[in-house]
Amino acid sequence: MIYAHHGHEIDFTATDVAFTFADTRPVAEGILAEPFLSGRSVPVASPALVGTDPVTLSAEWLLGVGLLHDSDLSGWKTWLARSSTVVPDRLPGAIFEDFNLLRAAALAGQGVALCSLAMVGPDLKEGRLVQLSESSVLDEFDYYLIQSNLTPRDAGRRKARQTFLSWIDDARTQA
């Protein structure tokens, strides 16, 4: 198992299992890819940041409370354009290369983040985050579970891989 970074090739002769985020199912020799989670992303924030009054998601309001970006500015630029909101020339806000850091910043009330509903579902259900709009981005993207077709030679590695895949299947069934 590896921690895969966006835009980096994964060597499946050395890696058994990986997750990727893509707009189409990955196809390559020696791998099996299956859809895992939807990438559909919506604006979310901490209830403490939003308060109890209804929120109008204008560019002014969003810039006032702060935007939290995942990897780059494209998500918010797309969301603002799709929402018929004027896209400012400059989009300030922290940029996170790791989704878990982005999520932590949103939970801590540091701003509004565009997050995959599948990834923050428990936070929304438990009231740790609130969804601010149905308008979404990355609807065409999904998280994919990719497995190498090669069977690990090492018995311990085979067992670890199977244990992990069984755990993933159980977790997905319970979700």
What do the predicted segments below correspond to?
Residues 1-26:
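Central regulatory/effector-binding core of bacterial HTH transcription factors
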Residues 5, 20-24, 46-47, 98, ...:
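Beta->alpha turn/N-cap motifs
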Residues 9-11, 32-35, 58-60, 85-86, ...:
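Short secondary-structure boundary/capping segments
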Residues 13-20, 41, 106-112:
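Alpha-to-beta junction loops
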Residues 28-67:
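Flexible hinge/capping segments at coil-to-helix
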Residues 65-84:
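Secondary-structure junction motif
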Residues 87-131, 138:
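Hydrophobic hinge/microswitch elements
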Residues 117-126, 134-175:
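C-terminal effector-binding regulatory domain of bacterial HTH transcription factors
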